[in-house]
Design a protein with these regions (language model features):
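Non-catalytic terminal/accessory segments
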Residues: 1-271
Length: 271
């Protein structure tokens, strides 16, 4: 039977205190074995959009992913799950684990750690939900829990996609037509004067072209959604309208509430 964790606090950036549960040495060893087993089972099935608490991934790989894939986005949705680590539903988590793990003894052991409780000021407290921050198995359990959300979002991304490429702007298309005419004029020039005029016209149009946006950012027939998650923080980039963003936020909020019993923070989830 795991022992209750020792509750301690560390300061957060906003001045508040973050609770940590420090397990005993024996429990740390057992948790590390559980973590290794869970990693062997789940690591290969996690989505590439997840970067927190994973081998060879970090906040730096998440930032690189944003730099590579968030090009051309018009809107950002910054997601914050209210008290995520404290509100993981134990029954839902065990149900998710049971989908891949057919070993009830192992699942009971995981549940014992979830229900081990903590001691603060010499008083024992039960834990009915959440995973203790500071526990060795907490990060991978959090990823397993939110992998359901990752898979939902990535399917949402595929359905949201609309159009093959953005429509060209009127100015860019006009420039293309004029440039084509100038090149034909150069090809059909009868003397040096006509040739020089055509070359000058081509250079002028090419110079103007540099300052003309080629694609229309307001094209309603083109839409894209990109997503990256690090631990319980996630970010979406949207090529679409603000109404699209509001619908995405509402859909994500409903999925988290109905499927994972989690709540989006209205104050911190921003468009």
């Amino acid at each position: 039977q795991p022992k209750p964790a020792r509750r301690t606090y560390i300061p957060k950036k906003n001045g508040k205190m973050r609770p940590l549960g420090i397990p005993s040495f024996e429990d740390k060893l057992l948790q590390e074995v559980i973590r290794m087993i869970l990693e062997a089972i789940y690591e290969g099935h996690f989505e590439n959009t997840s970067h927190g608490f994973r081998p060879n991934r970090s906040c730096h790989t998440a930032l690189n992913e944003i730099q590579k894939t968030f090009t051309g986005v018009k809107w950002f949705i910054e997601g914050d799950i209210k008290g995520f680590f404290d509100n993981i539903n134990h029954a839902t988590l065990i149900g998710i684990l049971r989908e891949r793990i057919n070993d009830e003894r192992f699942l009971r052991l995981v549940r014992k750690f979830l229900n081990a409780g903590y001691i603060e000021n010499w008083t024992f407290h039960n834990t009915y939900s959440g995973t203790p921050q500071g526990g060795i198995i907490s990060p991978i359990l959090a990823n397993i829990y939110l992998d359901k959300f990752d898979k939902y979002v990535n399917e949402y991304v595929r359905k949201f996609k609309k159009g093959k490429k953005r429509m060209r702007t009127k100015e860019y298309r006009r420039n293309e037509v004029e440039l084509s005419k100038a090149r034909i004029a150069l090809k059909n020039a009868n003397d040096d004067c006509e040739r020089e005029n055509a070359i000058a016209r081509i250079r002028q149009l090419e110079k103007e072209r540099v300052n003309i946006p080629p694609s229309d950012p307001m094209d309603n027939n083109y839409a894209r959604l990109v997503y990256v998650r690090y631990a319980d923080d996630w970010l979406c980039g949207v090529i679409g309208s603000k109404e699209d963003c509001k619908k995405i936020k509402e859909d994500f909020k409903n999925f988290l509430k109905e499927q994972l019993q989690l709540e989006l923070s209205e104050e911190k989830t921003l468009i």
